């Protein structure tokens, strides 16, 4: 694992925020998921296995490219 891989910070702004890691390769698959409650923070890293991270729910997301807030369910 390369410790210089990008990290992202995800802070849940509501209960039940799902964070899902997606795999690399010919077939994209879910390989890990976490459920966060309001105020909980997850620090995630892109690795040789993780090519994408999906956030479902209202959360604050910080990366080296900037900051964004995802929208909750309406």
UniProtKB/Swiss-Prot annotation:
Keywords: RNA-binding, Transcription, Transcription regulation. Required for transcription attenuation control in the Trp operon. This trans-acting factor seems to recognize a 10 bases nucleotide sequence in the Trp leader transcript causing transcription termination. Binds the leader RNA only in presence of L-tryptophan. The gene is mtrB. Oligomer of 11 identical subunits arranged in doughnut-like structure. The keyword Transcription applies. One of its GO terms (molecular function) is RNA binding. It comes from the Bacteria. This is Transcription attenuation protein MtrB. Belongs to the MtrB family. InterPro entries: MtrB, Trp_RNA-bd_attenuator-like_dom, Trp_RNA-bd_attenuator_dom. GO terms for biological process: DNA-templated transcription termination; regulation of DNA-templated transcription.
């Amino acid at each position: 694992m390369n410790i210089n891989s990008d990290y992202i910070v995800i802070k849940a702004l509501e209960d039940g925020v799902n964070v899902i890691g997606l795999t690399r390769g010919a077939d994209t698959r879910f390989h890990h998921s976490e459920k966060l409650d309001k105020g909980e923070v997850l620090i995630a890293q892109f690795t040789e296995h993780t090519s994408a991270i999906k956030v479902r729910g209202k959360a604050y997301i910080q990366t080296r490219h900037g900051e964004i807030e995802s929208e909750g369910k309406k």
